[in-house]
Amino acid sequence: MSTVHEILSKLSLEGDHSLPPSAYATVKAYSNFDADRDAAALEAAIKTKGVDEVTIINILTNRSNEQRQDIAFAYQRRTKKELSAALKSALSGHLEAVILGLLKTPSQYDASELKAAMKGLGTDEDTLIEIICSRTNQELNEINRVYREMYKTELEKDIISDTSGDFRKLMVALAKGKRCEDTSVIDYELIDQDARELYDAGVKRKGTDVPKWINIMTERSVPHLQKVFERYKSYSPYDMLESIKKEVKGDLENAFLNLVQCIQNKQLYFADRLYDSMKGKGTRDKVLIRIMVSRCEVDMLKIKSEFKRKYGKSLYYFIQQDTKGDYQRALLNLCGGED
C-alpha cells in the first residue's frame, strides 16, 4: 500500500474532526520560512537574464497561501512594486496562470475565476458550475464578500444578468451559501420525505418540478442529501444522476449532475474533472490549473487517492504525460509527488 493510501486509511479511521485543515493538503506551510529572504530570491530570479523560473516555482509552490501573502508584502516593501505585476511581466502562458493563481487568496482566486467566466460575450458555465457547486457555505460567503470588494458589484447580480431560467435560479440559490450545516441529528423521516418528493417532482410525473429539486438540493446538509440519494433508489427505478439526465437538459442538467456528484463524493468529483481535463487529445488547461491551485491546500491527498483508485494510474503520472517544462514542474509540485 502506498504512503498516500496508508495516510488516508489512517485518517479516515480516526475521523476528520480532530485533524488540522492541512491534513489532506499537498502544499503546507514551510517550516523554515523567511518572507524577506524569499522576496529577495524572487527579485533576483525575476531580474535574471531570461528569468529564473525554477527558483520562482520552487519558492511559490512550497509555501502556504498565508506565507505567499507575506512574501508579496515583503516584496512590495523591498522593491516598491507588486509581486503579481512583476511576475506577470516575467512569465507567460500556463505557468503564469499557475503562479498568479497561487498569489491570490483562495477567495480572491475563486472570485476572479467567476468574474472571468461571466465577462464579455457568452458565459463559461462550466467554471461557474464547478466553483459554485463545490464550495462550502463559509467559502461562498467569503467569495461573495471578496467579489463585492474587488468588482464593486454583487456576485448574485452578475449571475442574474449572465444566466437565465431554472439554471439561474439554481446558481443564485447555491451562491447564497445558505445550506444547512447542522449534521448532529439524522432525521430519517425527513430523509424519506425528501427522497419521495424528489421522485414525485421528477421521474414520477410528466415534466419536472425544478423549484422543488432546487429547494431540497440547495438547502439540506451534505450528509443528509447523501442519505436522501440512497433512499431515493427505493422509490425510483433510476438513481439520482440517471434521473437528472432523463428530466432536464443543457446547463441545468450539467449543474445538477455536478452538484449531486459533489454531494456524493467531492474528491471523486474533482478527480473526474482532472481526468476529463487530460484525457484524449489536448488538455483543458484552465480546468487543470484551477483545480490544482484551489485544492492543493484543501484536499489534494484525497483527490489523488480517488484518482488512482478509479483510473488505475496516479494523477502525478497523468500530469507528467500531459504537460511539459516549467508548467509541468509547477503542477507536479502542487500534486505533491508520486503516489
Swiss-Prot record:
Top-level taxon of the source organism: Eukaryota
Keyword Secreted recorded: yes
GO cellular component, one term: calcium channel complex
UniProt cross-references to PROSITE patterns, sorted A to Z: ANNEXIN_1, ANNEXIN_2
GO biological process: bone mineralization; calcium ion homeostasis; endocardial cell differentiation; growth plate cartilage development; positive regulation of calcium ion transport; positive regulation of chondrocyte differentiation; positive regulation of plasminogen activation; positive regulation of receptor-mediated endocytosis involved in cholesterol transport
Modification N-acetylserine occurs at: S2
Region (S100A10-binding site): 2-24
Alphabetical UniProt keywords: Acetylation, Annexin, Basement membrane, Calcium, Calcium/phospholipid-binding, Extracellular matrix, Phosphoprotein, Repeat, Secreted
Subcellular location: Secreted, Extracellular space, Extracellular matrix, Basement membrane
Modified residues (Phosphotyrosine): Y24
Main location: secreted
Phosphothreonine found at: T26
Entry keyword Zinc: no
Role of this protein: Calcium-regulated membrane-binding protein whose affinity for calcium is greatly enhanced by anionic phospholipids. It binds two calcium ions with high affinity.
Homology family: Belongs to the annexin family.
Subunit and partners: Heterotetramer containing 2 light chains of S100A10/p11 and 2 heavy chains of ANXA2/p36.
Miscellaneous remark of the record: It may cross-link plasma membrane phospholipids with actin and the cytoskeleton and be involved with exocytosis.
Protein's recorded name: Annexin A2
Organism of this sequence: Gallus gallus
